[in-house]
């Protein structure tokens, strides 16, 4: 795992971070995307469905603004810049340090 210091870690400055692919842009995937991006990680949020990515982009922006309004976050634009939305799985998995699976549970 190749980790680099982004110097923009918004949670704990100076902590090394890396890049992560999150597979699944539903509620849980969006939550993980926010957690990783706020910690300074570069995030690739993947979903097979392009409309799910459109919803994710809007919902993440809304959630970041909500955190700011409650005094629980800052710099939502900077955090959004760390999240890239990807509909190609191979591209999402290229050059990442970690993969977080957040797909639907179909039993």
Each model region followed by its residue ranges:
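Rossmann-like NAD(P)-binding element
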Residues: 48-55, 66-107
């Amino acid at each position: 795992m190749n980790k680099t210091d982004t110097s923009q870690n918004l949670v704990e400055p100076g902590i090394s971070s890396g890049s992560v692919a999150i597979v699944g842009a539903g509620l849980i995937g969006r939550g993980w995307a926010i957690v990783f991006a706020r910690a300074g990680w570069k995030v690739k949020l993947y979903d097979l469905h392009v409309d799910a990515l459109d919803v994710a982009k809007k919902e993440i922006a809304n959630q970041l603004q909500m955190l700011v309004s409650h005094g629980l976050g800052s710099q939502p634009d900077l955090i959004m810049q760390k999240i890239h939305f990807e509909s190609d799985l191979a591209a999402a998995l290229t050059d990442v340090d970690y993969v977080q699976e957040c797909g639907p549970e179909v039993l």
